[in-house]
A protein has these predicted regions:
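A secondary-structure boundary/capping signal
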Residues: 26, 41, 63-64, 81, ...
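Non-catalytic C-terminal accessory region of glycerolipid acyltransferases
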Residues: 3-4, 93-209
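Conserved beta-strand scaffold positions in the cores of enzyme catalytic domains, especially
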Residues: 24, 61, 82-84, 139-141, ...
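Catalytic core of membrane glycerolipid acyltransferases/transacylases, capturing the structured
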Residues: 9-10, 17-18, 32-89, 97
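Secondary-structure boundary/capping positions in well-ordered alpha/beta enzyme cores
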Residues: 22, 57-58, 83, 105, ...
Length: 209
């Protein structure tokens, strides 16, 4: 059976090396084994495939549930390791799926902003906090630079310009099933977002300067 993930990664890397000035930094920071959450800034459709390309292991993703209503897209996304998520509301099915993925020792990528930005880091959403604390797994921050100039599907197929993916150091939070108050959630979220912000230029950091 064809491994769609490997095929897509091969094509994407070829495209990046052909059309763009592509750079990867800190790839050795990625643990080879064990449950892992990648957290990254999000500017364009190509961003998830960048995480997949640089990772030495398969990465699971989430995508807005509306995309899965189109059957060909749903088949492709599921084959590529994506799971639907309902935005702007608490999606318990997502949390159950994510915890199951991590309990199996797999890797998951989340974009804490919840949607694409214009290149400047948006305020993070709290969902990542509850998952990080509930599981206590390793977290890898990733900073992506240059993809805001590659919007739409064309930016996935034919990315151009200088694109830099910088991988930071592993960090994690103490595992706990206790309820978190607002101040604790905000403090944990700020730490996650600041770890991402440190990997991108100051002009892209928004409120996390």
């Amino acid at each position: 059976m064809l491994d769609l993930n490997k095929i897509c990664n091969f094509i994407q890397l070829k495209s990046l090396n052909t059309f763009a000035d592509f750079h990867i930094k800190g790839i050795n920071n990625i643990p080879i084994n064990g449950p892992l959450i990648f957290v990254a800034n999000h500017q364009a459709y190509v961003d998830p495939s960048l995480i997949s390309v640089i990772s030495p292991r398969k990465v699971n993703f989430v995508a807005k549930s509306e995309v899965f209503k189109f059957l060909p897209a749903a088949i492709f996304l599921k084959s590529y390791g994506a799971h639907p998520i309902k935005r702007n509301k608490l999606d318990l099915n997502f949390f159950r799926w994510a915890i199951k993925i991590l309990n199996k020792g797999e890797a998951l990528c989340l974009f804490p902003e919840g949607t694409r930005s214009d290149g400047v880091l948006k305020r993070g959403l709290p969902g990542i906090v509850h998952l990080a604390v509930r599981t206590g797994v390793n977290i890898i921050p990733v900073g992506i630079e240059g993809t805001n100039k590659n919007p739409g599907a064309s930016g996935v197929l034919f990315p151009t310009g200088k694109i830099i993916v910088k991988v930071g150091k592993v960090f994690k939070f103490e595992k706990s099933n206790e309820s978190l108050n607002r101040d604790t959630v905000d403090a944990i979220l700020d730490k996650i977002m600041n770890n991402i912000a440190e990997l991108i230029p100051s002009g892209m950091r928004g409120i996390y300067k």
